[in-house]
């Protein structure tokens, strides 16, 4: 009676440990963020090119466009490893993707924990960033719009108080300051007037020369740091939800990549096993 020794081997070769669901789910997951990263880089580069070179170089460290480009490039490289690694079933790229994503997640977690544990130092760092932004207020249009939005949103002016605007060369109160905005504050510090159809951009003229009581009739006198801290304390659940929303995609990416890596390793072992037993007529 004729034997069919190679039928099980053929059956074994048709079987694969690699799940198409996991493979393509990870691929499309990375593809989505890959596209988002390219949009971020494109927007950042466009915003950068639209600025004057001198103004852009003056405040490179606080330029939102630079931050957008850096985050976009890092996300692009990370998701590129995930896309190609999952599509080509490349263990090296998948491990790189998983390790980098784990490092990003741990850094975010550590930053959040340290921010709560060392709240005073975090507050000092925020104060330093805000003061640096005030200094470069007129140098960068994006930064200027961001500060104006923040002061309107939180009903505040400056870092600690409205007099922090004296750090800016245009708003400085020194007698030798030739600027027309000397001792003033930006219009975003002004109290809203419901019946005013057109925004008065000169409403903050000379406000730093007044004391708190007099200035409070026209502008916000409280600093943005205290307002920001109070807002954070009042919206902890919202911030927790945002943090969770950022963490879940990262954890999903780490989990899927590790599952796929283990499946690829099992598939490699199966292929090696089949190759070693092909010479066996009873296999």
UniProtKB/Swiss-Prot annotation:
Q: Which SUPFAM superfamilies match?
A: Tetraspanin
Q: Where in the cell is it found?
A: Cell membrane; Cell junction, Adherens junction; Cytoplasm
List the InterPro entries hit by this protein, alphabetically: Tetraspanin/Peripherin, Tetraspanin_animals, Tetraspanin_EC2_sf
Record protein name field = Tetraspanin-33
Cytoplasmic side, ranges: 1-24, 86-96, 257-283
Q: Name one GO cellular component term.
A: plasma membrane
What is the first-listed, main subcellular location in coarse terms?
Answer: membrane
Which regions span the lipid bilayer?
25-45, 65-85, 97-117, 236-256
Q: Please give the Gene3D superfamilies that the UniProt record associates with this protein.
A: Tetraspanin
Q: In which tissues is it expressed?
A: Predominantly expressed in erythroblasts.
Give the PANTHER family listed for this entry: TETRASPANIN, TETRASPANIN-33
Glycan-bearing residues: 172
- Extracellular topological domain ranges are 46-64, 118-235
Which superkingdom heads the taxonomic lineage of this protein's source? Answer: Eukaryota
């Amino acid at each position: 009676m004729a034997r069919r020794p190679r039928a099980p081997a053929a059956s074994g070769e048709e079987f694969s440990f690699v799940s198409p669901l996991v493979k393509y789910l990870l691929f499309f997951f990375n593809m989505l963020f890959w596209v988002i990263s390219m949009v971020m880089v494109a927007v950042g580069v466009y915003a950068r090119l639209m600025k004057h070179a001198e103004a852009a170089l003056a405040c490179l460290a606080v330029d939102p466009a630079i931050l957008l480009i850096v985050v976009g490039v890092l996300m692009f490289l990370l998701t590129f490893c995930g896309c190609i690694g999952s599509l080509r079933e490349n263990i090296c790229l998948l491990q790189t993707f998983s390790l980098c994503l784990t490092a990003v997640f741990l850094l975010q977690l550590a930053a959040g924990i340290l921010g709560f544990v060392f709240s005073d130092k975090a507050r000092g760092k925020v104060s330093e960033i805000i003061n640096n932004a005030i200094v470069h207020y007129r140098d960068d249009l994006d930064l200027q719009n961001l500060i104006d939005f923040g002061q309107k949103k939180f009903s505040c002016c400056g870092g600690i108080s409205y007099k922090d605007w004296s750090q800016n060369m245009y708003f400085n109160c020194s007698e030798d300051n030739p600027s027309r905005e000397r001792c003033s504050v930006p219009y975003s510090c002004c109290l809203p007037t419901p019946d005013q159809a057109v925004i008065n951009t000169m409403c903050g003229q000379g406000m730093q020369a007044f004391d708190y009581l007099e200035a409070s009739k026209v502008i916000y006198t409280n600093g943005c740091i205290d307002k920001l801290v109070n807002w954070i304390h009042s919206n902890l659940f919202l911030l927790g939800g945002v943090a969770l929303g950022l963490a879940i995609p990262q954890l999903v990416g780490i989990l899927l990549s590790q599952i796929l890596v283990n499946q690829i390793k099992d598939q490699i072992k199966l292929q090696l096993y089949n190759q070693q037993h092909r010479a066996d007529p009873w296999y």
